[in-house]
Curated annotation (Swiss-Prot):
It is an enzyme of class 6 (ligase). Belongs to the class-I aminoacyl-tRNA synthetase family. Glutamate--tRNA ligase type 1 subfamily. Catalyzes the attachment of glutamate to tRNA(Glu) in a two-step reaction: glutamate is first activated by ATP to form Glu-AMP and then transferred to the acceptor end of tRNA(Glu). The lineage of its organism: Bacteria, Pseudomonadati, Pseudomonadota, Gammaproteobacteria, Enterobacterales. Its EC number is 6.1.1.17. This is Glutamate--tRNA ligase. It is found in: Cytoplasm. Zn(2+) binds at C98, C100, C125, H127. Its main location: cytoplasm. The keyword Calcium does not apply.
Length: 471
């Protein structure tokens, strides 16, 4: 039997981290089993579904490289198929037309609630033989079994049982002729030969209804696995106040897809004590019986730690391809300065996100108009004039511009003036970067370049002279 899973989001908003984890688990299970992964867009909610949301879902899937083997299928393009199946069910007696008015149903609901009963349809039209005109408005309901129970072996939670008495004769076609969500899902899973339905635990109550419809159709019943919810670190349901919840917001905030995938896979699944997983390792080790039944807590600090890890362990050339987008967002012209892969090596230890890297790298490529006030006040003082002049001359004299030779020039300046390295290094750092912090000074000066470094030292000397004249 070929294993087939699916990810079936509703395009009413962005791809959130809970949906992304569900997609990842479905994708990993299919890949682990040598099966296929289907993308299906469940867009039957015509009022809330938007093209922008569809695009956002596709963008998120593509950014995470969760490639699909089939699809994307759209439910709105399959209405003829759904209605054909409903007509077959009407003919077979497994579905029936219901003409009850909204007023009657509301009165029934209020009566049941007043008695402390669970609100459900009473089956009036199921047993009615009244004649109705062909054009009289009606819904179509599924004739749910009225005895026995539905038992399914959840691949994460174990056996789950529902009494059929607890289940309603749910509506499968509305008065406007449109099929409902629970019905469309069933026909899709049947037609697409889905073998494993991996989805959030909020769908558990839908499962017995869908199983009963599948059985009424004589269709095979897939295996189900319901993944627990993701909470914030305070134990409450994950929301925007816990940080970003959209996958693409994490891209915008400077996270690598590898970091988010690694974080999401561990958010409810484990393989021993291992924390870091490559994509290949995720595929190799993933198993549904290792997925936790308990809710997971989203920890942004852990995700940030993983992101920093991947910035420093993935190939700099690869990280640079993701950094490029952030550089463009900051409108930095990188034609004059280090290659982005080199920049990743320079700033990787200091920066935990690519956004932070893009926001702190401008001095490598563009001249700055002023020095950081605190750094200049502390380090660009008259006492710094001589160290800056001497190191400028030594840097200017270098014929082989390497980081090692830059280091020797700084060291030689300190030795010549008989001062500590800090007396040379700190004024030089402020002079060439405009700030009081940077990566190692030798690699920073080397990356900025000889002529630009000398120009900036001269600018710092002019700043010191101007400050002296004002005193």
């Amino acid at each position: 039997m070929k294993i087939k899973t699916r990810f079936a989001p509703s395009p009413t908003g962005y791809l959130h981290v809970g949906g992304a984890r569900t997609a990842l688990y479905s994708w990993l299970f299919a890949r682990n089993q040598g099966g296929e992964f289907v993308l299906r867009i469940e867009d039957t909610d015509l009022e809330r579904s938007t093209p922008e949301a569809i695009e956002a879902i596709m963008d998120g899937m593509n950014w995470l490289s969760l490639e699909w083997d089939e699809g994307p299928y759209f439910q709105t393009k399959r209405f003829d198929r759904y209605n054909a199946v409903i007509d077959e069910m009407l003919a077979a007696g497994t579905a029936y037309k219901c003409y009850c008015s909204k007023e009657r149903l509301e009165a029934l609901r209020e009566e049941q609630m007043a008695k402390g009963e669970k609100p459900r349809y009473d089956g009036r039209c199921r047993h009615s033989h009244e004649h109705h005109a062909d054009d009289e408005p009606c819904v179509v309901r599924f004739a749910n079994p009225q005895d026995g129970s539905v038992v399914f072996d959840d691949q994460i939670r174990g056996p789950i049982e529902f009494s059929n008495l607890e289940l309603d004769d749910l509506i499968i076609r509305r008065t406007d002729g449109s099929p409902t969500y629970n019905f469309c899902v069933v026909v899709d899973d049947w037609d697409m030969e889905i073998t494993h339905v991996i989805r959030g635990e909020d769908h558990i109550n839908n499962t017995p209804r869908q199983i009963n419809i599948l059985k009424a159709l004589g269709a095979p019943v897939p295996l189900y696995a319901h993944v627990s919810m993701i909470n914030g670190d305070d134990g409450k349901k994950l929301s925007k106040r816990h940080g970003a919840v959209s996958v693409m917001q994490y891209r915008d905030d400077g996270y690598l897809p590898e970091a988010l995938l690694n974080y999401l896979v561990r958010l409810g699944w484990s393989h021993g004590d291992q924390e870091i997983f490559s994509r290949e390792e995720m595929i190799k080790f993933f198993a549904l019986d290792a997925v936790s039944k308990s809710a997971s807590a989203f920890n942004t600090d852990k995700l940030l730690w993983l992101n920093h890890h991947y910035i420093n362990t993935l190939a700099p050339e690869y990280v640079a391809t993701h950094l490029q987008w952030h550089i463009e967002q900051e409108n930095i012209d990188t034609r004059n300065g280090p290659q982005l892969a080199e920049l990743v090596k320079l700033l990787g230890e200091r920066c935990k996100t690519l956004k932070e890297m893009a926001q702190t790298c401008r001095y490598f490529y563009e001249d700055f108009s002023e020095f950081d006030a605190d750094a200049a006040k502390k380090h660009l003082r008259p006492v710094a004039r001589q160290p800056l002049e001497v190191v400028r001359d030594k840097l200017s004299a270098l014929t082989d511009w390497t980081a090692e030779n830059v280091h020797h020039a700084i060291q030689a300046t300190a030795d010549e003036l008989e001062v500590g390295m800090g007396k040379v290094g700190m004024p030089l750092r402020v002079a060439v970067t405009g700030a009081g912090q940077s990566p190692g000074l030798d690699v920073t000066v080397h990356a900025i370049g000889k002529s630009r470094s000398v120009e900036r030292i001269n600018k710092a000397l002019a700043f010191i002279a101007e400050r002296e004249n004002q005193q």
